[in-house]
Amino acid sequence: MIERKEYMNLLEKWRDKKAIKVVTGIRRCGKSSLLRMFREKLLSDGVSEEQVQDLNFEDLDNEPFLNYKFLYAHVKQNLCPDKMNYLFFDEIQMVENFQKVIDSLFLLDNVDIYVTGSNAYLLSGEIATLLTGRYIEIKLFPFSFREFMQTQPAHTSRELAYRQYIELGSFPYIPQISQDREMVREYLSGLYNTIVLKDVVSRKKITDVMMLQSVVRFLTDNIGNISVIKRISDTMTSLGRKTTSHTIENYVSALTDSYIFYPVQRYDAKGKQLLKTGQKLYLADVGLRQVINGTKGGDLGHVLENIVYLELARRGGEIYVGKAGDAEIGTPCVMFY
């Protein structure tokens, strides 16, 4: 298993601090594995098994705990009263009213809480308000190229590895099946369908799945271009799929909530203000292009721009595209405060 050093260091930095550690990111980017590695580190540091509670809410064995009252009672009953307790909740957004559990447990002095989520619902609206000042978000992405290289045989050239990185993407499971391109495609296709059907269609109650798929293909085709909601709506209408800007806006919002796309706002560097129109959208992993739009090649410049965005996002800071005077800033840039 690849040690994701930067993320492990972040978790260690916030260990035992009075803040809920929220790990977010697209499905299968390694959130569960990261918490598993951190759990193992705690045990190697002398923390006892009794001090650790670990619940994955996608596991059928834990279905009774989807009821928040049962969950709270179970966790509370198993706390060590005179020691620090480490609580790991994987995909906790599946628990209705989960925020009540987290809020109540947070009031205790001897708990350190870690949660993961594959949907921005975890930190949306009233929930974000409730948890304001009580959490830190750790945004997890699929492997960086440096991490990807650690999965390759020692004799692999960087050039060959980078071609694979661009073509196949960097979800942590990909290196294990990279020799069989059909398996890679099936894996990515299954992952993509799960995200669209489970995290987008079901949660947002979208009825026109074909329209949603068309929007995803359009956004993927236009990685690196400024996306304007009205232009997307007009394009769909011109293709015989009449829709409204409001519908398209909801679809784009649902897609970014599922972390399959990340939005980047435009910024006027000279005027030092955000621009009100347009944004760029980048895929969470460039390998998804092959199952969304087929295996067509080309457009390497925008693929590399997407990879630049992901690397900047891993390193933190506020990321913008935009302009400086009349000059367009096409590549993502990062601003630290």
Please name every model-derived segment:
Residues 34, 38:
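Hydrophobic positions on the alpha1 helix immediately C-terminal to the Walker A/P-loop
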Residues 118-120, 125-226:
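Interdomain motor-coupling "hinge/lid" segment immediately C-terminal to the ATP-binding subdomain
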Residues 31:
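Conserved lysine of the Walker
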Residues 2-16:
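Pre-Walker A adenine-sensing motif
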